[in-house]
Amino acid sequence: KAWAEKFSRSINSVLYFFQLPYLLNDPAVKKIDQGIRQIKGANYYQIKVSFQIENGGEDFEDEYLYWIDVNTFEIDYLAYNYITDGGGVRFRSAINKRRVNGLLGQDYINYAPLNKKISLSSLITEFEKGALIERSRIINSDIALLPND
């Protein structure tokens, strides 16, 4: 049963990230604009996201940072901490961007820091220095939009 629950959380996580940025308008989401940050020569809005307890879901204690390109409004980078399964922090970089019937699809490289206690805001600096460890790649293949019947 523990394996099934962990697998279910993993699938939910993939679906959550695939639906970004649309889920950021959920009523349980608390957003804080932290200004503009330059990453690899491009400017990004840095947005901190947390969740209200009520309607915030099972993982309401998780926190996120999103870096949104000021020109395209696409999320190119994100970082998050999580409590489940022993907790930790992760950083993701978007790759393989493509449009499917106007909807942005993208894959991610999933990184972990050497120090699990690092702050979310420090992860982008560690990424730019090449100091994060690649843990996995999230590849969203065969993306298709089905008619809403």
Regions found by a protein language model. Name each.
Residues 45-143:
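Gly/Pro-enriched, hydrophobic low-complexity segments
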Residues 148-149:
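Short, solvent-exposed mixed-charge patches
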Residues 1-60, 82-85:
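Flexible, processing/modification-adjacent segments and terminal tails
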